[in-house]
């Protein structure tokens, strides 16, 4: 609706890739029986003291560095007080006064160009328990309670559902690249609270904010944003008033519904956590963690284009998933200079097809960069032809091994002996007189048909280039 501005901000909770919880040694194994990965600390027993997880601090700092944040050399924990069954000690350990990371941002690519979405801060906190509802009762599973989370709070700089999707997808890609989180949406490793407001054009002050809590699918976030924007615009355009509140997304109904009147920070009665000392980081420690960071996906895309001579589209697709880019680069380096485009062609066509058909990732299949490099070398050296290589690839993908071994064991080597090939060509011409007549009549495609017949006679082993040359020569003798 013209005449109004939409403002969106996101608070994204990301589960960090640690083996144990934030303030105790309990396992973070997913899918275990309810209330088995628990101890007095994460159950909130009186007198149980928290011990900070150093790995969680490291991963949060690495995330901040990847996102261009300023690292707070001294940060502190605070208690966020609230009463709800998912937090048995009645407070959550979080960071409010001095978070670990400040500023930074994510660059998104939109049809109209690039846009920088600024980040306000990143802080560490513990996750709450999970409440499971049934028809007869509600139960609380404390396995999740105490899971290390970092909350990435954007500035209210997004103006459409499309921008929100681009921001979240870019954020996920960067965090997965850095190895700080799996960002597995199905397991709840990446969840967002969405804040939306609308205001008339020309009005400086933001409109009344509505928050949609705990969204864990990109599809759901997009749909919730579309609905909530339409709801708010419909209300204000008819003289209605937007109430500051928290709402939830009901996917089955396709609408947001009220949960509670929105709390402000003072409602949580934040105060310093007395059982944890401040996090003090030296400059040397921050730089040591910076040295562990990989390239940003955007930088890797540009470098791969220059280093391997692959098209921008190929580089973009490969760089989108770190494991795909890692595999491609390993295979391209093994193949040697000038083979980047060949390796890219194999990955973008045959390998991507197999990944799509099986639903696997490149790390879940049995194909190795060494096997792909050897397959390319066998084709380049004319030990086998392209069709034979394509027949071998699914077996290498599913069962592993090296193509050279399979070629030797099955007698799949390419036939390049001139006498043998000439005999195949003569047989194909003899058995297909109509194709010869078509060629004489000017139908050059007939030569291609005869090449196919030779390949069939040789069970795909004939060297295609030599066959093509021989067929042309033999047909020329008959014109």
Q: What is each stretch, according to the model?
A:
Residues 1-295, 306, 312, 334-338, ...:
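Basic, nucleic-acid-interacting segments
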Residues 17, 199, 230, 348-356, ...:
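Amphipathic alpha-helical core segments of compact helical bundles
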Residues 188-200, 268, 305-329, 340-357, ...:
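Core structural elements
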Residues 279-280, 315, 327-330, 339-342, ...:
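Extended hydrophobic-aromatic, low-complexity segments
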Residues 285-292, 299, 330-337, 372-384:
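Extended, non-catalytic structural segments that build the interaction scaffolds
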Residues 309, 333-343, 381-384, 441-445:
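Structural motif
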Residues 362-373, 386-456:
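Strongly charged, low-complexity linkers/loops
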Residues 444-479:
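Short, amphipathic C-terminal "tail helix"
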């Amino acid at each position: 609706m013209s005449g109004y501005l939409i403002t969106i901000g996101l608070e994204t909770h990301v589960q960090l890739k640690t083996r144990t919880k934030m303030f105790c040694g309990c396992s973070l194994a997913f899918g275990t029986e309810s209330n088995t990965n628990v101890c007095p600390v994460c159950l909130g027993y009186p007198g149980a003291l928290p011990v900070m997880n150093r790995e969680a601090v490291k991963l949060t700092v690495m995330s901040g560095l990847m996102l261009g944040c300023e690292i707070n050399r001294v940060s502190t924990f605070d208690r966020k007080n609230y009463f709800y069954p998912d937090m048995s000690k009645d407070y959550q350990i979080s960071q409010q006064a001095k978070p670990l990371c400040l500023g930074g941002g994510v660059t998104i690519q939109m049809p109209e160009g690039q846009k920088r979405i600024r980040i306000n801060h990143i802080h560490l906190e513990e996750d709450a328990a999970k409440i499971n509802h049934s028809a007869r009762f509600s139960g609380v599973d404390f396995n999740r309670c105490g899971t290390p989370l970092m909350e990435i709070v954007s500035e209210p700089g997004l103006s459409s559902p499309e921008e929100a999707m681009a921001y979240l997808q870019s954020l996920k890609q960067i965090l997965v690249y850095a190895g700080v989180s799996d960002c597995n949406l199905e397991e709840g490793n990446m969840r967002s609270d969405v804040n939306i407001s609308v205001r008339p054009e020309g009005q400086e002050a933001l409109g009344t904010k509505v928050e949609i809590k705990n969204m864990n699918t990109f599809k759901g976030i997009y749909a919730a944003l579309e609905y909530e924007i339409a709801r708010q615009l419909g209300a204000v355009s008819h003289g209605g008033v937007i109430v500051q509140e928290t709402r939830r997304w009901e996917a089955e109904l396709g609408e947001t519904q009220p949960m509670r009147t929105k709390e402000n920070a003072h409602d949580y009665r934040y105060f310093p956590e007395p059982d944890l000392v401040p996090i003090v980081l030296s400059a040397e420690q921050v730089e040591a963690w910076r040295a562990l960071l990989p390239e940003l996906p955007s930088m890797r895309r540009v470098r791969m284009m220059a280093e391997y001579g692959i098209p921008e589209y190929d580089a973009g697709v490969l760089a989108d998933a770190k494991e795909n880019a890692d595999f491609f680069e390993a295979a391209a380096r093994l193949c040697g200079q000038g083979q980047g485009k060949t390796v890219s062609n194999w990955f973008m066509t045959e390998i991507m097809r197999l990944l799509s058909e099986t639903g696997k990732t490149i790390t879940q299949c049995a194909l190795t960069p060494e096997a792909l490099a050897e397959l390319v070398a066998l084709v380049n050296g004319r030990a086998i032809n392209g069709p034979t290589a394509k027949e071998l690839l699914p077996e290498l993908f599913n069962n592993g091994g090296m193509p050279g071994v399979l070629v030797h064991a099955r007698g799949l080597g390419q036939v390049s002996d001139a006498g043998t090939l000439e005999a195949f060509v003569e047989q194909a011409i003899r058995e297909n007189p109509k194709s010869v007549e078509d060629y004489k009549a000017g139908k050059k495609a007939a030569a291609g048909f005869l090449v196919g017949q030779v390949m069939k006679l040789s069970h795909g082993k004939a060297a295609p280039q030599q066959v093509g040359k021989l067929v042309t020569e033999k047909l020329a003798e008959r014109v």
